[in-house]
Amino acid sequence: MKPINIQDQFLNQIRKENTYVTVFLLNGFQLRGQVKGFDNFTVLLESEGKQQLIYKHAISTFAPQKNVQLELE
């Protein structure tokens, strides 16, 4: 049985559904936008037509505007 990767499932779901999300960084700064892509180290966030590439090690929390349905089986 393959281990569940909740992080990838969560990010992929908010990406596919174009869910608006608030990203809290470790320094307390907040970014708002939509996740357009991600890999093992970064998240691409788009807000008001501008893109920001954020390193995951700088992120504390993702807070989506609506609940995300994950398949944990």
UniProtKB/Swiss-Prot annotation:
One Gene Ontology biological process: regulation of translation, ncRNA-mediated
Record Gene3D superfamilies: 2.30.30.100
Record GO terms (molecular function): RNA binding
Source superkingdom: Bacteria
TM spans (from-to): none
One annotated Gene Ontology cellular component of this protein: cytosol
Keyword list, A-Z: RNA-binding, Stress response
InterPro entries: Hfq, LSM_dom_sf, Sm
Domain Sm residues, every copy: 8-68
Subunit structure comment from the entry: Homohexamer.
NCBIfam families, alphabetized: Hfq, PRK00395.1
Primary role: RNA chaperone that binds small regulatory RNA (sRNAs) and mRNAs to facilitate mRNA translational regulation in response to envelope stress, environmental stress and changes in metabolite concentrations. Also binds with high specificity to tRNAs.
Matching HAMAP family: Hfq
Family affiliation: Belongs to the Hfq family.
Protein name, UniProt field: RNA-binding protein Hfq
